[in-house]
């Protein structure tokens, strides 16, 4: 085995270093197989009882979480907030108070803004722009401004660009 140490020759000068090497050889170097076992920290007695009864710790998804195509991959992220269409005379506060999955209006507007950033759609404004040319449909209720576009419609299909493996490297002059 070889060790290398760097020892400064003078404490005031950091530019001069003295290198010394020590060689230590051992003739009986036998590798020892080892097993590392990891255990969690001690848990309170109540948690240990739950684990022993067969209730192992696992993620419990709520009923409104979507199972992506039945593959066991669940996700709670959604692009747009879906609001059921209501008759014109209904109060929006009654239906929202009974629905536990709806959130406050600040979160809705944040989710809506994120939807528009991801999809490239312009959000509706308070001036009443309807963006009919871009294919978006807005609801007649000014409080309910959600993105109801198809998200899949593109005006023109562009020619696919080559990926990194298909591009030729740029040559630089002088090399």
Curated annotation (Swiss-Prot):
<feature type="compositionally biased region" description="Basic residues">
    <location>
        <begin position="148"/>
        <end position="160"/>
    </location>
</feature>
<dbReference type="GO" id="GO:0004865">
    <property type="term" value="F:protein serine/threonine phosphatase inhibitor activity"/>
</dbReference>
<protein>
    <recommendedName>
        <fullName>Type 1 phosphatases regulator ypi1</fullName>
    </recommendedName>
</protein>
<dbReference type="InterPro" id="IPR011107">
    <property type="entry name" value="PPI_Ypi1"/>
</dbReference>
<dbReference type="Pfam" id="PF07491">
    <property type="entry name" value="PPI_Ypi1"/>
</dbReference>
<feature type="region of interest" description="Disordered">
    <location>
        <begin position="1"/>
        <end position="175"/>
    </location>
</feature>
<comment type="similarity">
    <text>Belongs to the YPI1 family.</text>
</comment>
<feature type="compositionally biased region" description="Low complexity">
    <location>
        <begin position="90"/>
        <end position="106"/>
    </location>
</feature>
<feature type="compositionally biased region" description="Polar residues">
    <location>
        <begin position="127"/>
        <end position="141"/>
    </location>
</feature>
<keyword id="KW-0539">Nucleus</keyword>
<dbReference type="GO" id="GO:0008157">
    <property type="term" value="F:protein phosphatase 1 binding"/>
</dbReference>
<dbReference type="GO" id="GO:0005634">
    <property type="term" value="C:nucleus"/>
</dbReference>
<comment type="function">
    <text>Regulator of type 1 phosphatases which maintains protein phosphatase activity under strict control.</text>
</comment>
């Amino acid at each position: 085995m070889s060790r290398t140490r760097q020892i400064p020759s003078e404490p005031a000068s950091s530019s001069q270093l003295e290198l010394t090497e020590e060689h230590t050889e051992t003739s009986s170097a036998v590798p020892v197989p080892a097993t590392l076992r990891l255990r969690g920290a001690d848990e309170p007695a109540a948690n240990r009882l739950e684990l022993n009864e067969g209730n192992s710790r696992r993620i419990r998804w709520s009923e409104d979480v979507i199972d992506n195509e039945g593959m066991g991959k669940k996700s709670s992220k959604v692009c747009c907030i879906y609001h059921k269409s209501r008759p014109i005379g209904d109060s929006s506060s009654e239906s929202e108070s009974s629905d536990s999955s709806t959130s406050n209006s600040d979160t809705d507007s944040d989710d809506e803004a994120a939807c528009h950033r991801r999809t490239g759609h312009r959000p509706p404004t308070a001036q009443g722009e309807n963006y009919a040319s871009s294919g978006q449909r807005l609801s007649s209720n000014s409080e309910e401004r959600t993105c109801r576009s198809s998200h899949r419609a593109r005006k023109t299909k562009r020619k696919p660009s080559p990926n990194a493996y298909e591009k030729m490297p740029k040559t630089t002059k002088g090399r």
